[in-house]
Design a protein with these regions (language model features):
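Short, glycine/charge-rich beta-strand/loop segments that flank catalytic centers
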Residues: 89-107, 118-121
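Amide-forming acyltransferase catalytic core, primarily the GNAT-like/NAT-type
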Residues: 1-48
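Structured loops at beta-to-helix junctions and adjacent beta-edge loops in soluble globular domains
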Residues: 6, 48, 66, 126-128
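Residues that form generic nucleotide/phosphate-binding pockets
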Residues: 17-20, 79, 83, 103, ...
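Conserved donor-binding loop and adjoining core beta-sheet/short helix segment
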Residues: 29-99
Length: 146
């Protein structure tokens, strides 16, 4: 199995897979993966039903959730587990949804440790609040603009 490095042309290949998931973290956006590709040595592998994205950080190999439709997620996760096993790497998943944690706990009981890494959570903003900057909560932002 050959993983390809992410480049600008990868978008066309990966786009259908990004469109097939409803994950709402920045790791599931092609632009983010492309922007950070050198820092995280991001690469991908495409199978008929799914795409696997892997990277490296501080010497540890990691993956985000497979890009797969819900009815193919079991197959994609099994593939990913085998990949890490064959490469003799510990399985390290990032940006995992609660739904997939429940799936992993059910399908692979006791196999994984689940740790919330608060430093890696995405920021979520209310668009209307940022547009108007009303209220005390946005006072510093308003003052910065003035």
């Amino acid at each position: 199995m050959i993983f390809k490095e992410i480049d600008i042309d990868s978008y066309k290949e990966l786009r259908p897979f990004f469109n097939s998931v409803d994950y709402e973290a920045c790791e599931y956006c092609f632009t983010t993966l492309y922007m950070w590709r050198d820092m995280y040595k991001t690469s991908y592998y495409i199978e008929d039903d799914f795409a696997i994205i892997v990277g490296e950080y501080e010497g540890d190999r990691f993956s985000v959730l497979p890009l797969a439709k819900k009815d193919k997620i079991h197959k994609a996760i099994a593939f990913m587990i085998n990949y890490f096993k064959n490469e003799d790497h510990r399985i390290y998943l990032r940006a995992v949804t609660k739904e997939v944690v429940e799936l992993l706990q059910k399908d692979y009981p006791g196999r994984f440790e689940y740790i919330e890494e608060r430093d890696y959570f995405d920021y979520v903003y209310d668009a209307e609040s940022l547009r108007t900057l009303k209220g005390r909560k946005n006072q510093k932002k308003r003052n910065h603009l003035n």
